[in-house]
Amino acid sequence: MADKKGSNSEKLLYCSFCGKSQHEVKKLIAGPSVFICDECIDLCNEIIRDEAAAAGVEASLSRSDLPSPQEIRDILDQYVIGQERAKKILAVAVYNHYKRLKHLDKKDDVELSKSNILLIGPTGSGKTLLAQTLARLLNVPFVIADATTLTEAGYVGEDVENIIQKLLQNCNYEVDKAQRGIVYIDEIDKISRKSDNPSITRDVSGEGVQQALLKLVEGTMASVPPQGGRKHPNQDFIQVDTTNILFICGGAFDGLEKVITDRTEKTGIGFGATVKSKQERDAGEVLRETEPEDLIKFGLIPELIGRLPVVATLGKLDEAALMKILVEPKNALVKQYHKLFAMERVELEIRPGALQAVARKAIRRKTGARGLRSIIEQALLDVMYELPTMKGVSKVIIDENVIDGDGKPLLIYEDTPKVAGSN
């Protein structure tokens, strides 16, 4: 092993791969008449890791032991609390999709169609997390796109083929991998057309985007500029076939429950009819009765609805579910903050009353699980700011008063309890 030396009289040694001298790198490792530096070793390790990951993707999609729907659901349970029916629907749909891909090369009279998925549920109910967890489980390229940023090609904004470009970027422009990936399109409800009737005027960010997405979701050859460039005439494009990409579309669909209720209550007219009041059923129960005609009335075009045959509805998370989300998943928020405080060699205790207060506040804000982190972050801000410069703190206790803003965290200094911010 050749270490760097400061002597001018010594003959300089150079890396045989990058040509850097021993003074430009941390270490030079000697072989028979050759040297390699630490930087080149790191680069080689990175190349090996990338190739191993690529081999893992191919193996995960071609192996005979594709996870069963029950195994997929069990893994979803580790990260997503509640939404049992949605997890079961997703597990079956994803299993069937990748089982279909495994049998593409086999000649058969029956051609299996792709089953893209539509997730309907309020903000913070777990739609995006479900899609992310599925992609991580299957070890396939994954991208999240925001439908509200999309416009028709030729207008200011992103066109739909930018989605495929991002998917390619996520797998280092390996087309075969991208063609078996998962695309999650969020806020799909925000591009609904403004009325039930087809638009007479140009709607470049609503119905126009739906028409553009239709081709992508159904399966087309998307032309993507190489290495993330902009489209220019006479430019070579990367051709990506979207036929086998799984598309998952999600949205809150605020107001859809009213459309469903209006439809279902039409039957309750006349003598002896039993009409349920709208308050008797919660929104989640109503959304489970979603029919294609309701989505058309809401503003999605029939052709796009037809390309999203699997519909899973997610209910609003109640206080008990939000409290479980804080502590039970593998990457639960409370576990994350325990780890952060442990890095300062301090124990963090968040009492059950505090967890309940966090859940209540998230429900009041109508942010669902997505708002939990900001509530905890706000409550712990002062103590996380002061803690690195404090001496002798062994434990921090958070109760419901801290969450509600009526108190401060209790700090344990060896044997003496003190309140954060007190002298």
UniProtKB/Swiss-Prot annotation:
It comes from the Bacteria. GO terms for biological process: cell division; proteolysis involved in protein catabolic process. Gene3D superfamilies: 1.10.8.60, ClpX chaperone, C4-type zinc finger domain, P-loop containing nucleotide triphosphate hydrolases. Residues 3-56 form the ClpX-type ZB domain. GO terms for molecular function: ATP binding; ATP hydrolysis activity; ATP-dependent protein folding chaperone; protein dimerization activity; unfolded protein binding; zinc ion binding. The keyword Cytoplasm does not apply. ATP binds at residues 122-129. GO terms for cellular component: HslUV protease complex. InterPro entries: AAA+_ATPase, ATP-dep_Clp_protease_ClpX, ATPase_AAA_core, Clp_ATPase_C, Clp_protease_ATP-bd_su_ClpX, ClpX_bact, P-loop_NTPase, Znf_CppX_C4. CDD domains: RecA-like_ClpX (cd19497). Zn(2+) binds at residues 15, 18, 37, 40. Pfam families: AAA_2, ClpB_D2-small, zf-C4_ClpX. Keywords: ATP-binding, Chaperone, Metal-binding, Nucleotide-binding, Zinc. Belongs to the ClpX chaperone family. HAMAP family: ClpX. NCBIfam families: clpX, PRK05342.1. ATP-dependent specificity component of the Clp protease. It directs the protease to specific substrates. Can perform chaperone functions in the absence of ClpP. Component of the ClpX-ClpP complex. Forms a hexameric ring that, in the presence of ATP, binds to fourteen ClpP subunits assembled into a disk-like structure with a central cavity, resembling the structure of eukaryotic proteasomes. This is ATP-dependent Clp protease ATP-binding subunit ClpX. It comes from Burkholderia cenocepacia (strain HI2424).
